[in-house]
């Protein structure tokens, strides 16, 4: 009498992680992909500026921060300024 064959599952493939954007739409001039983020990890400051209308913003960052975090802080600061 023979032993039953065991069925082995195929190894799962790792899903590719899409990189996050570093260029965003400007909330002031409404141009697409003109705001560029620069992260200064040594000084813990994130800079974002628009190449068209020259608007800029800077905020404090930490070791977990990504460019999208700087952009969202900028949009939140714009909304607070409009509501105040």
From Swiss-Prot:
GO terms for biological process: transcription elongation by RNA polymerase II. It is found in: Nucleus. Belongs to the ELOF1 family. The keyword Metal-binding applies. Pfam families: Zn_ribbon_Elf1 (PF05129). Transcription elongation factor implicated in the maintenance of proper chromatin structure in actively transcribed regions. GO terms for molecular function: RNA polymerase II complex binding; zinc ion binding. Coiled coil: none annotated. It comes from the Eukaryota. Zn(2+) binds at residues 26, 29, 50, 53. InterPro entries: Elf1, T_Elf1_sf. This is Transcription elongation factor 1 homolog. Gene3D superfamilies: 2.20.25.190. The gene is elof-1. Keywords: Metal-binding, Nucleus, Transcription, Transcription regulation, Zinc, Zinc-finger. One of its GO terms (cellular component) is transcription elongation factor complex.
């Amino acid at each position: 009498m023979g032993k039953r064959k065991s069925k082995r599952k195929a190894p799962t493939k790792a899903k590719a992680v899409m990189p996050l954007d570093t260029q965003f739409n400007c909330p002031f001039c409404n141009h697409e992909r003109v705001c560029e983020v620069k992260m200064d990890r040594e000084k813990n400051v994130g800079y974002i500026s628009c190449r068209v209308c020259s608007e800029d913003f800077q905020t404090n960052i930490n070791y977990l921060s990504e460019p999208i975090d700087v952009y969202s802080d900028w949009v939140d600061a714009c909304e607070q300024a409009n509501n105040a």
